[in-house]
Amino acid sequence: GGHKPAKVEADLSTGWAVDTIKFALNDALVNWAYSLTKDVEIPASVSVAKFRSQFTDNPNARKPPFVTIGDTLSASTYWHGHHLNHWANDWVKLYSSQQGNFMTSNMEDSGTMTALHRLARINKVDANRVLILRTASNFTVPPPGKTATWSATAEYPDKGRAALEAAYRV
């Protein structure tokens, strides 16, 4: 194990790490997909807009739904709150040589990517042809005045259907 917290990606070689900690997508493929989808109109219901309006400290959270490019962090634990969000930002920065931009959390993408990269090692898939589409149905931090517990247990507006609709349209 390491003797002190890693500050830059090079520090990771002094501790325990595996090659399935981070996955980079093909930038050209990502940019191609973004160019095709960046102007897709994603509808938002009144209840979704009302929920978003609570996030007075986050201008992006209050915007209508939009297509963007960013990084996700996979974890086996469903987490929320400012402290863990800070940790997630640090983790993404560390594993991306300070280039990553943490946007969303997820649980399944690391498993999917691990499987695809293992298949790539035996020439069954081309990992350079992988794209991941994420839609957001909730936030990793609560709005001002709410707790992380509230954030983790708040009902999704319209039961998360807006995220499904966004995935279909994009």
Cite the ranges covered by each PLM segment:
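Accessory terminal and edge-of-domain segments that mediate assembly/interaction
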Residues: 1-170
